[in-house]
Regions:
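Transmembrane helix boundary and interhelical loop/hinge segments in multi-pass membrane proteins
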Residues: 56, 68-69, 374-388
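Peri-transmembrane interface segments
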Residues: 21-41, 327-363, 378-381, 388, ...
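Hydrophobic alpha-helical membrane-embedded segments
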Residues: 39-52, 306, 364-374
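Interfacial transmembrane-helix starts/ends
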Residues: 400-408
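Basic-flanked hydrophobic alpha-helices used for secretion and membrane insertion
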Residues: 115-365
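Alpha-helical transmembrane segments, especially those used as permease/efflux helices
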Residues: 1-65, 69-107, 415-416
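C-terminal transmembrane helix pair
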Residues: 407-416
């Protein structure tokens, strides 16, 4: 009884740790500890339970001596005693089955939710800015094309942006050599370098003006910000990277741009993104006051919009344009649509769901097979025992009912 109670407490603690006690991705290795504890405690639960159950039911004489209950309970107790290890393995397989199935369904639901939250507009376009037009491999025509804006480029293909798009928002991305991951971490850089030595600390951080971000935030249903002349905010949604940047923000880390210092408005990054996607992958860009960024630091112009009219017709027009290789090569454009993102995500979701169901069903079948083989291996012994019952006058109906109960309890017991 003592072993059973202790094992139940340890098993409960292990399940708590697996489900809610461990929620930090940086300590995921610790998850093996509760799994091992759960396995050991499950073994001792079954080891102690057979005799305990028998004693409990023997004390309840009305149940124990009713019909063939005494025979069924002793048979069940004997089976549990001889199958403690295999029953523990089956419980672990069922645990894995539940984890695989729930994880697959959770991932599918998460992908579907992300499609709604992270791809709120129908189309997005981006165009390189401040390209070095003196590069030798650029033709004269390409140099002229790179100077064109979105409307002028599409007009060349007979497509009117104003007529076919609505809710259009334009914004720009900037960079500065002095604003890198290393510089934005400040004093926290040395600590981060030891923990994550392979991060690309010299990569520059994407910058955006306050007004551009607020226009984008209104379109993407994100939180707007109002900055003072010496403030900045970090915006992103990839939590693992944001956890690092939040530590730097808590230290009031300043960034210097054009010999002027800027300090964080908040002590943690705010949720947001500038590129439509199917998963949260924005590692964090910086929003600065409008006068902090100049056009010579602009690296990309972007546009987001909804279709103004029949979606299929507009997409057909766009596809007829993008099928021409010159659209991308001669104009420095990239294009992405909600439909493209959804199609890619649906494929991934289907694969995840299929694998989850496949593995889950395989484990369930394996569990049933182990129990069935155990029953078959003991069928000769059981036959002799039931023959003895016939000899003492027990009718077939009662024997069949007892056999059904015995097998049913044996198959259902690991699920408890």
């Amino acid at each position: 009884t003592v072993i059973f109670i202790i094992s139940c407490i340890v098993l409960g603690f292990a399940y708590y740790q697996v489900t809610s006690g461990i929620n930090n991705g940086s300590i995921v290795k610790i998850i093996y500890v509760p799994i091992i504890l759960g396995s050991i405690s499950t073994f001792f639960i079954f080891w102690s339970l057979s005799g305990l159950l028998l004693r409990i039911f023997m004390s309840i004489k009305k149940i124990y001596y009713k019909g063939l209950n005494s025979f069924t309970l002793r048979q069940f107790s004997s089976k549990i005693n001889t199958t403690v290890f295999s029953t523990t393995i089956i419980c672990l397989m069922l645990f894995i089955t539940i984890c695989v199935l729930s994880s697959a369904l959770s991932m599918k639901n998460s992908l579907n939710k992300n499609l709604t939250d992270l791809s709120p507009r129908d189309i997005e376009l981006s165009k390189s800015s401040n390209v070095n037009l003196e590069e030798s491999d650029l033709t004269d025509i390409k140099k002229q094309n790179l100077r064109l804006n979105f409307e002028e480029i599409f007009a060349k293909f007979g497509f009117d942006i104003d007529a076919n798009f609505k809710n259009t928002v334009y914004f720009s991305l900037y960079f500065d050599d002095s604003v890198t991951l290393k510089s934005t971490l400040g004093s926290y850089y040395k600590i981060t370098k030891k923990q994550y030595p392979y991060l690309r600390y010299n990569d520059y951080i994407i910058l955006m003006t306050n007004s551009d971000y607020n226009n984008l935030a209104a379109s993407f249903n994100l939180e707007k910000v109002t900055l003072k002349s010496n403030e900045y905010v970090v915006v992103g949604n990839y939590q693992e990277m944001l956890n690092i940047k939040n530590e730097a923000l808590k230290r009031n880390t300043k960034i210097t741009l054009n010999q002027k210092s800027y300090y964080p408005k908040y002590q943690k990054a705010i949720n947001g993104f500038y590129e439509m996607e199917s998963q949260k992958s924005e590692v964090g860009f910086i929003v600065l006051p409008d006068n902090a960024l100049s056009d010579d630091k602009k690296i990309m112009n972007r546009m987001i919009a909804d279709y103004n009219g029949n979606q299929a017709d507009i997409e057909a027009k766009i596809n007829s344009i993008t099928e021409k290789t010159s659209f991308y090569t001669d104009y420095g454009l990239t294009l992405n649509t909600k439909k493209d993102i959804r199609d890619a995500s649906v494929g991934l979701g289907a694969i995840v769901t299929f694998l989850g169901l496949y593995l889950g069903i395989i484990f369930l079948i394996s569990c049933a097979a182990i129990l069935a083989l155990k029953e078959l291996s003991e069928s000769s012994d059981n036959a002799e025992k039931f023959n003895m019952l016939r000899k003492i006058g027990v009718d077939e109906k009662m024997i069949n009912k007892t056999l059904f109960r015995q097998i049913g309890i044996f198959f259902m017991f690991p699920l408890l």
